[in-house]
């Protein structure tokens, strides 16, 4: 009988799906889902999926994916297609050093844009404040607060 679960881990050929048991269920993806677009990462961590778990001693099968609420994705460099890194999350926590290594606002900005495009709330956490001046902290804080 099919069950609904959440993908909690992905390896090259397997997905680990939490269906409320003590251990996650090891699953394969059905060929008909894979052949729709074999180059694309169809199932991501966080996806809600319907799985067939008929035989408790064997790996299950992912039958279909349920619609995503949110996603954090990036463009794959080879063909510019979207690669979903995580789905159905509520928040993205971006941890960035103020110093050592220096703050990289371009990188932080990309996370904010990716989170916003995927429907996620994004929060910036600044680390290594003890190595920074009050002015450096205030400058970064004021910049991102002014952006919303």
Identify the role of each PLM range.
Residues 121, 130-148:
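Canonical P-loop GTPase G-domain recognition
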Residues 1-105:
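N-terminal accessory targeting/assembly segments
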Residues 88-91, 118-122, 147-148:
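Short glycine-/polar-rich loops that comprise or flank the Walker A/P-loop
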Residues 106-119:
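Histidine-anchored nucleotide/phosphate-binding helix
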Residues 46, 115, 127:
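Residue-level signal for inorganic ion chemistry
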């Amino acid at each position: 009988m099919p069950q609904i679960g959440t993908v909690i881990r992905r390896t090259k050929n397997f997905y680990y799906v939490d269906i409320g048991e003590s251990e996650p269920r090891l699953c394969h993806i059905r060929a008909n889902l894979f052949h729709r677009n074999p180059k694309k990462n169809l199932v991501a961590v966080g996806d809600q999926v319907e799985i067939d778990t008929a035989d408790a001693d064997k790996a299950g099968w992912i039958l279909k994916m349920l619609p995503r609420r949110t996603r954090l994705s990036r463009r794959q460099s080879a063909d510019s297609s979207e690669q979903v890194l995580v789905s159905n999350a509520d928040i993205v926590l971006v941890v960035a050093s103020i110093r050592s290594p220096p703050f990289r606002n371009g990188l932080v900005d990309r996370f904010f844009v990716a989170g916003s495009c995927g429907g996620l709330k994004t929060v910036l956490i600044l680390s290594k404040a003890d190595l920074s001046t009050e002015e450096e902290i205030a400058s970064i804080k004021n910049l991102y607060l002014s952006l919303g």
